[in-house]
Amino acid sequence: MCGIVGYVGMRSAQQVLLDGLEKLEYRGYDSAGVALTQRDGIRVVKSKGRLSALRSKLEELALPQSGCGIGHTRWATHGEPSDVNSHPHSTPRVSIVHNGIIENYGALKERLIAKGYTFASETDTEVLVKLIDSCYHGEPLQALQAALAKVRGSYALAVLFKDYPDTIFAVKRESPLIVGWGEGENFVASDIPALLKYTRRYSVLEEGDMAVCTAQGIRFYNEFGEAVEREKLTADWDMEAAEKGGYPHFMLKEINEEPAAITATVSPRVENGLPELRIPELTDEMLRSIGTVHLVGCGTAMHAGMVGKTAIEALARVPAQVDIASEFRYRDPILKPEDLVIIISQSGETSDTLAALKLAKSRGVPVLAIVNVVGSSIARAADYVMYTYAGPEIAVASTKAYMVQLCVLYLFALRLAYARGQLTEEKTKYYTAQLLHASEVIKPRLADCEQIKYLASRYVNTQSCFFIGRGFDYALSLEGSLKLKEISYVHSDAYAAGELKHGTISLITDGVPVIALATQKNVYEKTISNAKETRSRGARVLLFTTKDAEVPEGVATEVIRLDEYDDILMPLQLIVPLQLFAYYMAVLRGCDVDKPRNLAKSVTVE
């Protein structure tokens, strides 16, 4: 998730911007840059890599002091990390920094090329700044309104115009942006930590707002161009709390960012109601020729692959296999030229997963990577890439990255099914619309925190528990169990519910918790029967099911009911309460939620 800072006032804008960007480093970034107003125009300085590289460049340049500028730390979404792809992006008249994704940037770029504009980078932001430039005729607000009316997507923008050297224009749509109030100076930022060294007074831009910031004051306009007032707030957070957005832990913050991550990942890949992979080389003709899909990952990514396997086989009727990367690379897998290997990794640097990718390529099998980090080793090595736009994930236990890995796998499964004629256009559009709606479907689950917290308090002293489920629910059992044990240190195992009688049931004794997932209608009665078996042996059964499901008396100790949703997409809703349950168990047990013992965010060794 990119970081934005803007400053106008009597101080050195360069220093204020660097201070602010440093406080946003926790968001993750691969490059940084600033734009500073000068007597002869706007000077842009940017650099790939750490903020220290940008500092060094600025020290070498020794620019005249400027009292107005904008800065940016970039998390790549379009174009690999590089100086040319870094922000700010500029024309001789306009400079901008941007957080968000412009969904229709390709079509806009073609129109701008037809008007004579040229492009140096691969980014959607360069398209945006040149679109604004094309609409600029001396009045910045009119230019911004005209340009943004043509844009589809999300953005938080800070904009400089050469003709207005003492003014920052800020615009917000579906990406967070605030302004800070000072004395004879004012600020723009994507998050509060960037401001706290200089001010604690701020206002939050509402959807569609534009703010005009000068040293003397800030004016607000709504999406219709009407002058409005925005409430002045006072931040009473310390720096650590500010970085977490007011949440006690990054993990809880990231769980609550899942709706936005779903929208950012899915929306740009839907056109005319149909899923689009946005990979020109991976044509429908190639999809029709795929033999077997091999899904490979480690830990949570492998669990996402299990959901993907079930979706691919259910929707596209294509054989699919799931492998743990460390097993795949050493078991001499049978791979055929017509197969496709899908590599799943949040970081794009996972050692075993990268080795599995290299093995597949050495056998002449095409590789599609699903990763969250643009320009990562896996992204560079794969034949095709689909990025998950989760933004940086700070907590070691993956939550929002897993969520959008599922979304990308569903998009792939739907396109594969459509290309192969297994789904009609009508049915494909139905599933795609349901997937787009997922961000709204999960919001009530995020609001159920108190119920989940209460249940966690009832199970907090548990030493061992079991998860059971069938089909998609089994895949979710594995992930729910992993989340619980990795952050709360409660021993937990997950089993296919039908396997209980094949040994596992011998471990069920009085008071042992069994978390039963029963959201799939075609196997609901069988899963309930399995849960009842454990209950009859003294287990405490926590049942997750849907609102319309009939739960026989005596089956469950507690029941969590989910909204009705398509069975195939139900994992998107079910995972949220499972993540929250693990989170609150860890909190109540006094565990280090964001940094569990012995674990690393990216495993780059075997």
Predicted segments, located by residue:
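Conserved short alpha-helical segments that host acidic/polar catalytic motifs at enzyme active sites
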Residues: M1-K244, P248-H249, E257-T292, Y330, ...
